[in-house]
Each structure stands twice: as C-alpha cells, then as structure tokens.
Regions:
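N-terminal beta1-alpha1 ligand-phosphate binding loop
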Residues: 1-23
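Conserved RecA-like P-loop NTPase ATPase core
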Residues: 2, 58, 91, 121
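Hydrophobic/aromatic beta-strand patches that form the interior of the parallel beta-sheet core
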Residues: 3, 32, 58, 103-105
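A short beta-strand-to-loop transition that corresponds to the Sensor-1 phosphate-sensing loop
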Residues: 6, 92-94
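Short histidine/acidic/glycine/proline-rich micro-motifs that form metal-
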Residues: 6-10, 63, 111
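Short glycine-/acidic-enriched loop or helix-start segments at secondary-structure transitions
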Residues: 12-14, 68-70, 97-100, 116
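S-adenosyl-L-methionine/SAH cofactor-binding core of RNA-modifying enzymes
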Residues: 26-87, 93
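Structured adenosyl-cofactor binding patch, chiefly the S-adenosyl-L-methionine
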Residues: 94, 98-139
Length: 139
C-alpha cells in the first residue's frame, strides 16, 4: 500500500503506472492519494492491539533508514513472514508527520521531489520482488 499526499502529475504518472503494472505479477499494490489539507492519519489503518500483527507503517523521510536493494527485499520479506501489510507514506512537498509510523525509510541522502519519490519507491518495490522471486532484473 502506498499512501501519498498530493495528486500525481505528468510525467511521473506514466512512470508510476508502468511500475504498478510490473508489480501486479508479484504483489497487490494499492495507491491512495490524499489532499494536502486532508492529512494521512485518518486513511491509515488503526494500530494493532498489543502483540497484534496489523499493518506496518513506514514513512518516507530524509532521516529514515537507508537500505541497499537486497536488504530492502529482506525487509519486505520479514514483514510478509510476520503477516503484516506494509503501508508506505509519501509526504507532500513540505513533508508530513505520521506519529504512528513504526519505521522511517530514506531513499537516499539527496532530497527528491515528492512525486519522483513515488516513482523511485515503486521501482525499488518491483526490484525487491524480483530479487525475492530469484528473477533477473537486479544486477
């Protein structure tokens, strides 16, 4: 699940749709867009009860954890093995705060436009699933 602030615009829309089609073979992916004034908190799943295995919320953030592609694929597989759906939250141009996020993910040390961050995230999700499936794509 990718929850993003703001409406995706060209040329990024086509790239996101491209990776969405590629990912469909490997995983169910839902993209939800919210207006900047709407806030993301009300669209996120409720926190699981103590010891529960509800959704895992990861906020894309400059100060988040960075992974190489293989480690990111293991991160996803660990959540899958735990029976947890992963929700990635992509903030708007001014960022966003998600207090219930269990994890903060950085796509790298450079600042990216929030719409480009969606493309990079989907490409990395596709790459991770190809790695997990043992299929060629990642070199």
């Amino acid at each position: 699940m990718v929850l993003a602030v703001g409406r995706l615009r060209p040329p990024f829309h086509d790239d996101v749709q491209h990776y969405r089609r590629l990912l469909a073979r490997h995983a169910k992916l839902e993209l939800i867009e919210v207006r900047e004034d709407e806030g993301v908190e009300r669209r996120l799943p409720r926190a699981p009860a103590a010891g529960g295995s509800g959704a895992f919320v990861s906020l894309l953030a400059a100060d988040g954890r960075q992974y190489d592609s293989v480690a990111f694929s293991r991160f996803l597989e660990d959540r899958r093995q735990a029976g947890r759906d992963v929700w990635f939250v992509v903030g708007g141009p001014y960022g966003t705060d998600v207090p219930q996020a269990e994890h903060r993910l950085s796509l790298g040390p450079m600042t990216l436009p929030h719409q480009l961050a969606r493309v990079v995230l989907l490409e990395q999700l596709y790459r991770a699933h190809k790695i997990l499936a043992g299929e060629p794509y990642h070199h």
